[in-house]
């Protein structure tokens, strides 16, 4: 057996243990006990985003880290956004753009999802520098001597902030294991590898595997969770957002140093939705189809 096949065989009853939704891109989200999942991900996840009125383009925490200090919760009609000072506003308030611009100290406007055909809405805004490598290093939080993530397979994201018609980074569902977080914590006890830094939709428990990042063994596999079927598309290359401070988490660039040093800058996996359905906490996870090509280095980005 290959390392990948052996690792999958060693997994004992993987289970969904936490479920998260982020109603506004790059803001803090909410915990769920159950949810519906469509082909575009968890219902209501990343359904809104801010547009940079100074440089253009939809913006997330990579460019506007202050976004991560705001929280968004699903309301009856639209999300309610809460600032660190306790003030809140509904996403459809007449004054929401001015309110957000004040809280972020940057001119922005808030937008629901627009149709995918409106490409200009999703096109990237002006870069901070004309030096493309420097721009990538800044976005991904990489030092000059650290490798930049391999973005082959993500070419669309060089032109657009997100796949047109969506506000997620690359794929509609992100997954992380409790074991990956615990492993990173053990490698550097000074760093807080808190799940909130990594913003997964699904946090799962994968007992039995000795792999430090067991979910990465599933890249290329098809899984069932509840009545949902997911295709695991790639590992998740991490960006500078994981290092920013918000809520009770301090700014900590050592998070990225550890990710680069121990997991090639990746943590968690991305999935597409092959069959819509519903998810609940404690749902069992089943491998329906193994990766077609065994991958002995499962934390490579494809």
Where are these regions (language model features)?
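Metal-cofactor-dependent catalytic cores
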Residues: 2-302
């Amino acid at each position: 057996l290959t390392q990948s096949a052996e690792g999958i065989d060693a997994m004992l009853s993987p289970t969904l243990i936490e479920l998260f939704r982020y109603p506004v891109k790059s803001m803090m989200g909410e915990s769920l006990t159950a949810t519906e999942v469509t082909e575009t991900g968890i219902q209501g996840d990343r359904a809104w985003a801010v547009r940079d009125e100074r440089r253009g383009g939809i913006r997330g925490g990579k460019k506007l880290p202050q976004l991560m200090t705001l929280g968004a919760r699903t309301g009856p009609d639209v999300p309610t956004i809460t600032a660190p000072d306790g003030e809140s506003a509904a996403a459809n308030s007449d004054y929401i753009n001015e309110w957000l611009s004040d809280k972020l100290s940057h001119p922005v406007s808030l937008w629901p999802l627009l149709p995918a055909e409106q490409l200009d809405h999703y096109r990237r805004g002006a870069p901070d520098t004309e030096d493309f490598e420097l721009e990538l290093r800044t976005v991904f939080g990489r030092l000059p001597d650290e490798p930049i993530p391999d973005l082959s397979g993500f070419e669309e994201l060089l032109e657009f902030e997100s796949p047109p018609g969506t506000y997620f980074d690359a794929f509609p569902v992100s997954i992380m294991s409790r074991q990956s977080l615990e492993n990173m914590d053990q490698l550097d006890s000074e760093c807080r590898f808190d799940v909130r830094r990594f913003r997964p939709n699904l946090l799962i428990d994968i007992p039995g595997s000795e792999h430090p990042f067991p979910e990465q063994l599933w890249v290329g596999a098809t899984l069932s969770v509840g009545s949902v079927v997911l295709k695991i598309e790639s590992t998740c290359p991490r960006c500078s957002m994981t290092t920013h401070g918000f809520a009770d988490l301090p700014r900590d660039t050592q998070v990225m140093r550890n990710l680069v040093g121990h997991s090639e800058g990746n943590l968690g996996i991305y999935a597409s939705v092959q069959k819509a359905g519903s998810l609940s906490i404690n749902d069992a996870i089943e491998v329906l189809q193994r990766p077609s090509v065994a991958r002995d280095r499962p934390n490579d980005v494809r």
